[in-house]
Amino acid sequence: WNLCASTWGFFMPYIFENVGKLSNSVSQLMSVGSFVISFLATFFIFMQLGDRMSRRLLYGIIGGIYVIAWFVWTLPADMLSMWMLVMFVVFAGINNGSGQQAFYQLWCSELFPTKYRATAQGLTFFITRILAAIWGFSVPMIMESFGFRYAAMLIVAFAAISWLVGTIGAPKTEGKTLKQIEIERYGHEVK
């Protein structure tokens, strides 16, 4: 998911304008719209449902729509229509507010013992940021050599892998205290 997020952060205005054929102002509106949707999704989906329903199911639904969102960009550019681009913005915005990033941070907080939590989170963030930077440098070369649709197919593959790993491997931690989770995972409290 972080490779997809890296693409969004570095290249979405370019993609909206050059692949989606939007004006610069509409491209910027799409980015702002996605941010607003992310904000709303964080409050109305993640904060309201994250502790009340199966997190695996919630993650599965949100991760699935994220794969669908990026799939739009694998279509030939002449097939893209405004409703598809708006759907991409809405689906990606929902994910960005209540999908992989939110669950990743939640699970990092829950699954690592307090004693090791900062180190573990720091290491995982370090690795993902390095990979995202490498991917960010690679995207223009991939687009130049193979075209944007190929890059989009890779992004869909990354989103699908993240979706499957999170959906299949999601821990059942909802409604449990950190102490309960720690004892379940390690057999005792980690001192």
Residue positions per predicted region:
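Cytoplasmic membrane-interface "Motif A"-like loop-to-helix N-cap segments
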Residues: 51-63
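Loop-to-transmembrane helix entry/capping segments in MFS-fold secondary transporters
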Residues: 24-25, 114-124
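C-terminal ends and interior cores of transmembrane alpha-helices
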Residues: 64-79
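Extracytoplasmic gate region of multi-pass secondary transporters
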Residues: 1-39, 136
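Interfacial helix-cap and linker-helix signal at transmembrane-aqueous boundaries
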Residues: 16-17, 48-50, 139-147
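Hydrophobic core of transmembrane alpha-helices in multi-pass small-molecule transporters
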Residues: 83-99
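Helix-to-loop junctions at the C-terminal end of transmembrane segments
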Residues: 41-54
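Intracellular juxtamembrane helix-capping segments at the cytosolic ends
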Residues: 98-112
